[in-house]
Amino acid sequence: DGDYDKTRDKRETTAPAHVVDSRIQRLKAIDVTAKVRRGQNVVLQNTELLKGAELAGLIRYLQKREQLTDQADREMVLICWLMLLLGKTYEEIVDLSVFDELDGLTSGLYLDQKGEGWRCFPVSYSAKPHLDDTSKGLTPTQAFVFTPCPKFLLPMLRVGYAGGLKPLFLNKTITVEILQQRLKTYSDKSIEGGRITSDKLSNFMQRYCFASGCIDPVVLDFSYRLVLTQTRVSRSYACLNDDVRQDALLRLWNAVGLEIKAADPDVTLPAFFELRAWPHNQTVGSTFTPSLDTCKRLQSSLLSRLEEHKPARTYSYDSVIRYHNRYVLYTAYLLMFATGYRAVHNPLPSLSLHLKTYGLLAISDKDDADFTHARLVCVPPLLSQQLSYYEEHLTSLADFIRYRLPDLARTIDHLLRQDELMLMQHPTEAAAWYKKIKNSRTILGPLFLFHKQNDHWVPINIAPKDLIKDQPESLQLPANAGRHWLKSELIKRKVEPEWVDWQMGHWMTGQAPLAYYSALSHVEVSALLGVVIDEMLKEVGWKSLPSALT
């Protein structure tokens, strides 16, 4: 008995009873579900990334095979290059076309009359563009996007091409099995030690972007129609012109080239990407992004109408009310443009959510009962000053209306004392309180408008429809236009993708900036990001304005 070992020998056959055991079957089902969930989260699950030395060895191998006269060798070389440079699988590569006319566009390579090559792909839109977008003040977008093709690929792409619309690979002598076998043979003989696979080739660009943070992956999405997991949401908000998109691609491949050269200084690198302007305007992405001119017109309209409603020295009751409405709309629009706040009822439900000392704002605009997506975002100095002015405005407003609307005056006093009241509450009580006021249409928040009902002014929380109705007649912007503008401008100014996602609340599974194990310093990021957003706001014309009531 002393020699008895309870440890089961792994080589033993599983008891037949285990095969039909319901408990074990449930565990297996859970395991499968977990695998499916991981499979949907491509970037975090598949982390194998080609190193500089592996890429250098592969480039030498491809350059050597390209010199051979065998058609299969040249086809394999072209497939490998396209998988690496387009981020597409073998099946997607062999379905591409080559054409020299712009009629009936499709995915593939376009050869223009000058003999230059362009990679052409349709753009995937969450909401389709409309013909009247420009008249609404929105940035017009295109259905197809053209990206310069590296010149070193053109000789291989032109082999056997005589004009018209043709498949890129007519014979398809290289099947996916042959490609995998050749890559395996190369890897077995490689002195770098890493294994080159078709999966590593086709996913290199997106994994490199995610690992290095050199550019926002949405650039790849729009350029090559990749529809990546990590760009599913952000694709709806980013709007990129050709200069921004091509500059990002150039930075990406310059960074890759430096890593390859650091690993192998003697390797001869081709020009992975070359800047070349497409003859026509190419803006792709969000169909709800206001143009720079539109943003200036909106701000100018808000400012001029605020000036028009300044009360006279007598400060009549009606003039004070109307001025308050204009001041709230100006502040609300600035809040949306500066923070990326979603269009919701009762944004900024409490002034205590503005952490002035740290330059942060707590937002829970698209959340669940557990505040899974609650976030802290940067408050640029210009907005921080405006929120301080707004507090002073509410103090003066309460004094002006205390005789006529005593209940509302007391409510405003309560809103202004929320900081000290919060400190007296237990976290559980504070959470319950916040669930009641968040996006509330009945409990009054700091941003409210007076509406005329039966000859009486009634305060109602500001809503998305109020922002839309207040726009000049020449504009028809969505209520969350500021969110689209903010995302696009941050990418344009080459802000770290991680910071952009943090500000916008675009997180993937496993990312938790507010978790205990997070290494992200919100205060440091906010200090740096605030300077950038401040410049963006001032370029449009936004100012922090003290109230005429103070």
Could you say what each language-model-derived stretch is?
Residues 31-90, 202, 292-343, 481-483:
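Basic, Lys/Arg- and aromatic-enriched nucleic-acid-binding interface segment
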Residues 131-194, 204, 283-303, 380-475:
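Active-site/catalytic core of tyrosine-dependent DNA strand-transfer enzymes
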Residues 223-257, 272-289, 504-549:
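Catalytic-site neighborhood detector that most strongly recognizes the C-terminal catalytic loop/helix
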Residues 1-7, 12-20, 70-99, 176-179, ...:
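Non-catalytic DNA-binding core/recognition domains of DNA-processing enzymes
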Residues 1-19, 23, 31, 52-63, ...:
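Conserved tyrosine-mediated DNA breakage-rejoining catalytic core shared by Y-recombinases
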Residues 253-308, 403:
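Long, charge-rich alpha-helical interaction segments
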Residues 78-113, 216-221, 329-359, 495-502:
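Short, charged phosphate-coordinating catalytic segments
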Residues 64-68, 170-222, 226-231, 313-323, ...:
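Short, basic (Lys/Arg/His-rich) helix/loop patches that form interaction surfaces
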